[in-house]
Amino acid sequence: MTIDLSGQHALVTGGASGIGATVARRFAALGAHVIVADLNDTDGAQVAAEIGGEYHHLDVSNAHEWAALVGPHGALDIAFLNAGVTTRLPDHPPTDQPLEEVTDAAYRRIMGANVDGVVFGARAVLPKMIERGRGHIVMTASMAGLGAVPFDPIYALTKHAVVGFAKSLGLIAGTHGVCTSAICPGFADTNIVSVEAKQMLGAAGVPVISPERVADAVITAIEAARPGSVWAVWGDLPITQYEPNPPFHRQRPRR
């Protein structure tokens, strides 16, 4: 990757660990000043100190906290909206999250982190990006946003929402020079995937990818600068743009 981020300001949510921490380190290595945001203050501050960035406590599901974070920073060049959770029902393995046992609180938790967090984040950073006529908003979706996930249907719901949001917002933001994109990793080796789930995936021959591969995809999306693009990351296969259907703004060929 040859992209140079010198002098740019990048925000990473969920930056205390896993994919977020890896991308924060990658941005810093490429020259960016990185703002790490998370609920985990200890690990988040450690990552920020390691890369010479800054740390901010942030509940991505809280619109007021978004305003307090983004307001004083001026325009950002990159926002990586990465924070997310799975359903995680008590007394059930991660491979069995029955809908009938999901409480209202559990539902609001996952929707707040995975959907509200992306919408509130984009809403907070977009105006100043539009004002400057440039910027990148990269969202972490999942392969679960491109297909069916029978063991956690609500997680799949949230990631389908992220994919649709990134594609649709790209049609608007792209006319102002701002690129939105979604990254769809397969199962990544992070704390969101339990040891039990990793063992099950390995036994089934499903690849578990490294956070570094996801960081590669984020940089690929930024370099490509294609508004509304969706990028698939699966095993060792090349990182590719995923586009199963013609975009809404293109006319279908006549029959």
Region roles according to the model:
Residues 85, 98-119, 134, 138, ...:
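Catalytic Tyr-X3-Lys loop
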